[in-house]
Curated annotation (Swiss-Prot):
Subunit structure: Homodimer. UreD, UreF and UreG form a complex that acts as a GTP-hydrolysis-dependent molecular chaperone, activating the urease apoprotein by helping to assemble the nickel containing metallocenter of UreC. The UreE protein probably delivers the nickel.
Keywords: Chaperone, Cytoplasm, GTP-binding, Nickel insertion, Nucleotide-binding
Protein name in UniProt: Urease accessory protein UreG
Biological function: Facilitates the functional incorporation of the urease nickel metallocenter. This process requires GTP hydrolysis, probably effectuated by UreG.
The gene coding this protein: ureG
One biological process term in Gene Ontology: urea catabolic process
Pfam hit, one: cobW
Compartment(s) where it occurs, according to its Swiss-Prot or TrEMBL record: Cytoplasm
Organism: Tolumonas auensis (strain DSM 9187 / NBRC 110442 / TA 4)
Binding residue positions for GTP: G14, P15, V16, G17, S18, G19, K20, T21
Length: 207
């Protein structure tokens, strides 16, 4: 769609290794033919996630910007989001018709949240390998994100996690809020996530 207003800003958070970068890769590859997309990644002292996404061919390199946050990565997405806001603005100016900018947080914990200034919508990724108790631990990422993604469900038998318990706990911690199981490596759950972004972000695919 041709857009004169600001792009939809989607914050993607979750603990280290949960699958944030993997999610961004599959979202970009499946959505890029229908929407104008860019990505901002956050790492403490490197631009590793930017490199991973670029080498994976998720988007053209100029559409992926890496922010080196230094110190605490939570601050860059919450208390002082200026570096990320500047990156989003620079991308918006460079590509005047952006529909979506994904902002990936640095590795964080269950208490990390995005500033409303920075993210219009938030997706939080956790994974089964952390154990079935993760949903019931709560925290803003679990309870307040717009969409919760429970990734790596294929590992459940190997780590002794019961998906029915995780489902029950998630429904209890997120009454009326959407969530989905996923195996991003195999593409499972990706269409559900895209449908959520498109519907709730009120995006119109280009012809």
């Amino acid at each position: 769609m041709t857009q004169t207003s600001s792009p939809l800003r989607v914050g993607v958070g979750g603990p280290v290794g949960s699958g944030k970068t993997a999610l961004l890769e599959v979202l970009c590859k499946k959505m890029r033919n229908h929407f104008e997309i860019a990505v901002v990644t956050n790492d403490i002292y490197t631009k590793e996630d930017q490199r991973i996404l670029t080498e994976a061919g998720a988007l053209a390199a100029e559409r992926i910007v890496g922010v080196e946050t230094g110190g605490c990565p939570h601050t860059a997405i919450r208390e002082d989001a200026s570096m990320n806001l500047a990156a989003v603005e620079a991308l918006s100016e460079k590509f005047g018709n952006l529909d979506v900018v994904f902002v990936e947080s640095g590795g964080d914990n269950l208490s990390a949240t995005f500033s409303p200034e920075l993210a219009d919508m938030t997706i939080y990724v956790i994974d089964v390998a952390e154990g079935e108790k993760i949903p019931r631990k709560g925290g803003p990422g679990i309870t307040k994100s717009d969409l919760l993604v429970i990734n790596k469900i294929d590992l459940a038998p190997y780590v002794g996690a019961r998906l029915d318990v995780m489902e029950s706990d998630t429904n209890r911690m997120r009454p009326e809020k959407p969530w989905t199981f996923a195996n991003l490596k195999a593409g499972q759950g990706v269409d559900t996530i895209i449908d959520f972004i498109v519907t709730h972000g009120m995006l119109t695919p280009k012809a």
